[in-house]
Amino acid sequence: MSTYKLAAKFAASLYALALPLLSSNALAANGAVADEFKWMTFAVFGVIIAITMGITYWAAKHTHTTSEFYAAGRTVTGLQNGWAIAGDYLSAASFLGIAGLISLYGYDGFMYSVGWLVAYITVLLVIAEPCRNIGKYTLGDILAFRNDPKKTKTVAALSTITVSTFYLTAQMVGGGVLIKTLIGIDYEVSVIGVGILMLAYVVFGGMKATTWVQIVKAVLLVLASILLVIFTWAPYGFSLPDFLQAVVGDAKVQAQVAKLLGDAATNMSKEELGQRFLEPGLFLKSPIDQISLGMALVFGTAGMPHILMRFFTVPTAQDARKSVIWAMAIIGGFYVLTLFLGMGAAINVGPAKIALIDKGGNMAGPLLAQYVGGGADSVLGNLFLAFVAAVAFATIVAVVAGLVLAAASAMAHDIYVGVIRGDKATPKEQVTAARVASLIVGALAIYVGIAAKGQNVAHLVALAFAVAASGNLPAVFLTLYWKRTNTYGVILGMLVGAISAIALVMISPNMTYPQQVIKDAKKVLEGEPAQPAKEAVPAKPGEGFVCELFAVCKKAEAAKPATAEKPAKPGGAEKMAKMTEKLAATTDPADKTKLETDIGKLDKDIKKAEGDLKKFENDKTSMVGLDKPFFLLKNPGLLSIPLGFLCVIFGSLLFRDTRSEAMWDELYVRQHTGLHAEGALAH
C-alpha cells in the first residue's frame, strides 16, 4: 500500500477516534469557554486540522527518497523557507508564553522577544550560508565534514535529542494547557492528541509536510496577531504614548506590581506602581540574570538543530541567506506585536484573571481575543478566541513536528545510518529508519509533555536555548572558523557545554525546593503573624562577583525602605469566609465581578497549598539533595556558554587530529563557494 493511502487511512481513523473522545466525560467544566460556545472551538480546530492533514496527504505523495524526507528535496525557495523558519521559530513560547509573561511581569517578559530576534543576526552573519554549503541533513553532518564522523555524529545526535526534548516539553505543555482550558479535555488526553497529529505530519509527510504546515501556521499566526493588536490599540487612536499611559494608570496592573514587589511597594504611589510595570526587575530581578538570559537567547538560536535543518531545504547558499532575511522581517514584526498583546491583556483582562486561568500566563493571548471580541458571553468574542486558540494550536503542532523531525534525523541518519551502518544503508532503509525514529521521539514527546505539567513554556524554551548555546554553537562556530579545531575539542566542548548547562539548571531557582513550597503553602492556609515596623536598611555591597552566582558568600543587597507595622494576615479559610460574605452583600456589578475573580483565585490557591503540603510532607530537599538554590541565576548561559567555547579550544590544543587538519582547506573553500555542496533534486 502506498504512503499517501496510509496517510489517508490514518487521517480517517484519527477523525473517527476524535469524535467520541471530544464528546466523552473527559470534558471538564472549568475551561475558558462556556459550554454553549464550545462547538465554535471544535469547528475552528477541525478546520485547522483538516487543512494540515490535507497538506500531509499531498506531501506524502511526494516523499519517497531520503532527501525528500529530510530536506524536502532541497526545492524550497528563500521566501518560502523564510516563512517556514518563522513558523518553526514562533513557537508556543512566542505566542502563549511571551504574551503571558508580559501580561504578568511587563518589561521583563518583552526581554524574551528582544533576545530571540537579535539571535538571527548571529545566524545570518556566521551560520546560515556555511552550514548550507557544508551540511547535508543534520547538525552531525556539519561537524563530521572535517572531524571524525562516527564520534562527532554520536555526540551531535545526543545533543540534538537533549535540546529537542527540552523544547518539545515546552510545546507539549502549551498544547495541553491550551486544549484543556478552552475545551475542558483532560491535560493528559490533550497532550496525546497533539502528539498523534504531530506524528502524522512527520511520519507520512516528512520535511515537505512540515515545511508547508509551518508556512500556513506562520501566516495565520501573524494575521491573528495583527487583528488582535488592531482591536486592542484602536481605542487609544493607535497612539503609543496613550496606550502606555493606560497601562501605567490601570488599577489591575498596579495591584499586580504591588503584589510582586511586596514590602518594597509600601511607600509607592499608584502611578509609581504602574510605571514600575514598564521597567525591568519584576521577573528577572538581577541584572546579571538578564545578561545570562540574553546570552542564551542570542546565541542559542544558532545552535538549535531544527533551525539548522531548515537551511538544508533550499537549493543554494544564497537562498539560505535570503531565508534568514525574510525570517528576521517576519519574526521582528511579530515580536513587536507581542508587546501590545501582553500589555493589552494586562489592562483588559487583568493579571489576576489570567493567572487564575493559568498561573504561567499562557492563556493571555486567547483571553484577550475573547475580550476584544465582546467578552465571555458573546458569540463574536468566543469565535475570535476559538480562531486565535486554533492558530496557537497549529503553532504548537507545527513546531513540535519540526523538533521531532530534527531529533528523529539525529537518531536515524546520524546514529543508525552514520554510526551503526557506516553510511551503507539503502535509501529505503534510511527512510524507514527515519519514520521509526519519529515514532520513538513522538512517544518521548508525549511522555515528557505529561510529566512537565504546569510549567511556563517560555521559561522552558529559554533553558533549551541555553543548552544549544553552550553545547552546539561553540562546536559549530569553531569548526567553521578556527583551523585548529578538531574532533577532541568538538566532543569535549559539546559534552561539557551541554552537561554544565543542565547541571546548573538542576541547582538553580528553577527547581522545586520542598521546604520553601511548604512554607509558602502554610502562609496561604494559616496566614501570617503581625509584623512590627521596620527601619530603612541601606544597600549592602556583596563579597564579590562569585557571590552573585553561587550561594557561597553574601551577595549584594538593595536598599530597603522603612515599613509601618503590619497586622496579622488571616488564613485561607478565614479570608474565604470574609470574601464570600462581602460578595453576598455587594450590589455593584464591578465589585461583584472582582470578588468572584478573587474568590476563584483564592480557592485555587488553597487547593494548591493543600496539595503541596500533602505532596511534599515527606520531602526535605530537591531532587539533587539541596534545600535551597546553590546557583543563583535562573539561566546558566553566562557560565555555560563561555565554558563550552573554552572546552572546544582546550581539547583542540591538547590533542591532535590529522583528519581535522587535513580537511580544513576543503572546508574553507566549500563553505565560501558552495563547491560540491548538496544540490536540489530534479523533478
What residue spans do the PLM features occupy?
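Membrane-embedded helix-loop-helix hairpins and adjacent transmembrane boundary segments
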Residues: 2-15, 20-683
